[in-house]
C-alpha cells in the first residue's frame, strides 16, 4: 500500500494520541519532515506525495521510538534555544523554555560597559554558556560540568554557534576546581527530588541523564553544594541566578543569604510558578 504524506500524518497523529503524546500532530509533522530531510512547509505543499518504502521504514522506526518515550529532540538531534540551534543527545538535559527565561534575566543583569567573566555551572549541552557568549560580546565564559560527555556536546555547540574562542570548558564537581572570581553566575542545577524521579514522565525518567535531574533528597542537595563556596568566586556587584523547582524558592533564597548575597528575590516563570532565585554580591 502506498502512503501519502497526508495519510501517514493522520495515522501517526492517532498513534501518538494513543500513546499520550501531548502535541501529536505537531510531533508527527516534525518527525516526518526530519525523516524526509525537508522542512514542515514542504509537507503542506505536497500532501499527496507518496513515500518510498525506505522513507516509510525510516519514519516508522522514528515514531516507534517516540511512542516508547524517546524525547523528540533526541530523535531529530537538535533543539532551538534563544534563537540559536543546539545539538542534543542522551548525554545532556534537553533544554526547557523556562531556561530561556533564565538566560533572558541573566542578560538583563549583565554589565555591558566593560569586560566581564561569566560562569555557567552544570552547563550540560552548553545552551546557557553559548547564549551568554553570543549575546554578550564583552564576556568571557567558563562552562563547568561533571560529565565529560556533556562537555563534549557543549564544545560542539560552541563551535557551531561561533563562540568557542570565548568559552572555557572545565570538568568539575560544581566549584571544586574552579578558580577566580566572576561577574555573572548562572545555573540550571538538578532540582528534582530524588524521591520523585520514578514518577517523572518516561521520556525524562528513562532518557535524560540522572546526573542532570537528580537533586538528591528534597531536590536541594545539589543546590546546597553549588552555593556552599559561592561567595569566594564572586566579584563585588556580581549577579547570581539559579533555576529552581516548584516550592524551593524560600529555601534557596536562604542559601543565597548564607552565601553572603543581598537583594535576594524569588521570581516566577511565565506560567506563574516560582522558578528563579536571584541575588547580588556586595
Give the predicted meaning of each segment.
Residues 1-38, 42-44, 51:
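Non-catalytic accessory regions of SAM-dependent methyltransferases
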Residues 16, 110, 158, 230, ...:
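Conserved hydrophobic residues forming the short capping helix/wall of the S-adenosyl-L-methionine
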Residues 30-108:
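Conserved AdoMet
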Residues 31, 69, 99, 128, ...:
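Residue-level signal for inorganic ion chemistry
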Residues 97-199, 225:
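Conserved SAM/SAH cofactor-binding pocket of Class I
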Residues 163, 208, 234-236:
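Helix-to-beta-strand junctions that scaffold the AdoMet/dcAdoMet cofactor pocket
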Residues 191-222:
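Mobile active-site "lid"/loop adjacent to the S-adenosyl-L-methionine
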Residues 217-280:
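Conserved Class I SAM-dependent methyltransferase catalytic core
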Amino acid at each position: 500500500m502506498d502512503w501519502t504524506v497526508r495519510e501517514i500524518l493522520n495515522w501517526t497523529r492517532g498513534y501518538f494520541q494513543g500513546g499520550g503524546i501531548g502535541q501529536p500532530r505537531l510531533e508527527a509533522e516534525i518527525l516526518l519532515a526530519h525523516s524526509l530531510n525537508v522542512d514542515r512547509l514542504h509537507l503542506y505543499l505536497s500532501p499527496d506525495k507518496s513515500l518510498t518504502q525506505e522513507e516509510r521504514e525510516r519514519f516508522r522506526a522514528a515514531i516507534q521510538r517516540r511512542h516508547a518515550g524517546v524525547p523528540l529532540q533526541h530523535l531529530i538531534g537538535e533543539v532551538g534555544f534563544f534563537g540559536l540551534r543546539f545539538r542534543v543527545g542522551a548525554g545532556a538535559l534537553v533544554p526547557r523554555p523556562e531556561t530561556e527565561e533564565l538566560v533572558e534575566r541573566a542578560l538583563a543583569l549583565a554589565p555591558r560597559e566593560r569586560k566581564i567573566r561569566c560562569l555557567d555551572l552544570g552547563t550540560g549541552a552548553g545552551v546557557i554558556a553559548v547564549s551568554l557568549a553570543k549575546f554578550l560580546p564583552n564576556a568571557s565564559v567558563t562552562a563547568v560540568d561533571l560529565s565529560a560527555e556533556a562537555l563534549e556536546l557543549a564544545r560542539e555547540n560552541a563551535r557551531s554557534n561561533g563562540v568557542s574562542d570565548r568559552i572555557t570548558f572545565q570538568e568539575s564537581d560544581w566549584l571544586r576546581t574552579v578558580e577566580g572570581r566572576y561577574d555573572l553566575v548562572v545555573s540550571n542545577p538538578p532540582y528534582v527530588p530524588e524521591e520523585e524521579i520514578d514518577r517523572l514522565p518516561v521520556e525524562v525518567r528513562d532518557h535524560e541523564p540522572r546526573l542532570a535531574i537528580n537533586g538528591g533528597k528534597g531536590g536541594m542537595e545539589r543546590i546546597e553544594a553549588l552555593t556552599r563556596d559561592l561567595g569566594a568566586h564572586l566579584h563585588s556587584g556580581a549577579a547570581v541566578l539559579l533555576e529552581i523547582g516548584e516550592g524551593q524558592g524560600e529555601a534557596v533564597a536562604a542559601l543565597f543569604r548564607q552565601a553572603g548575597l543581598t537583594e535576594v528575590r524569588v521570581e516566577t516563570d511565565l506560567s506563574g510558578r516560582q522558578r528563579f532565585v536571584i541575588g547580588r554580591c556586595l
